[in-house]
C-alpha cells in the first residue's frame, strides 16, 4: 500500500472524498447568512477513521462565528456524509479555522517591506 509519510493511500482517498462532499454540503445545505464563504483547505483523518479535523478559511465572516456555526451543524453534516459515503465508519467532524493562509500573506508583506527597504538603501 502506498503511503505518504504515515498516512495510507486509503486514508488520503477518504479524506479527499470527505473534503469534496463537505464542501458541496456546506454550500448547498447550510443556509446561514452569518457563515460567509467557506473554503475547506484540508481534512485530516485519524488512523481509525473515527475523527476528522476539517480545516477551513472563511471570507465575509468572522472565523470564530463560522467555526461556531460549523460546530453547531457538525451532527447534521455527519448524517449527510453517512448517506453519501459508502464506508463503515463516518468520522466525527471537528472544524478548525486554518490560519496558514493569513500567516503566508503576513510573511509575504514582511518580505516585500524588507525588499523595499533594502532597495532604498542600495
Swiss-Prot record:
One Pfam entry name: RBFA
A Gene Ontology term for the protein's cellular component: cytosol
GO biological process entries: maturation of SSU-rRNA
Keyword Cytoplasm tagged: yes
GO molecular function, one term: ribosomal small subunit binding
Localization, UniProt: Cytoplasm
Classification via SUPFAM superfamilies: Ribosome-binding factor A, RbfA (SSF89919)
UniProt cross-references to InterPro entries, sorted A to Z: KH_dom-like_a/b, RbfA, RbfA_dom_sf
Protein role: One of several proteins that assist in the late maturation steps of the functional core of the 30S ribosomal subunit. Associates with free 30S ribosomal subunits (but not with 30S subunits that are part of 70S ribosomes or polysomes). Required for efficient processing of 16S rRNA. May interact with the 5'-terminal helix region of 16S rRNA.
Assembly behavior: Monomer. Binds 30S ribosomal subunits, but not 50S ribosomal subunits or 70S ribosomes.
Protein name: Ribosome-binding factor A
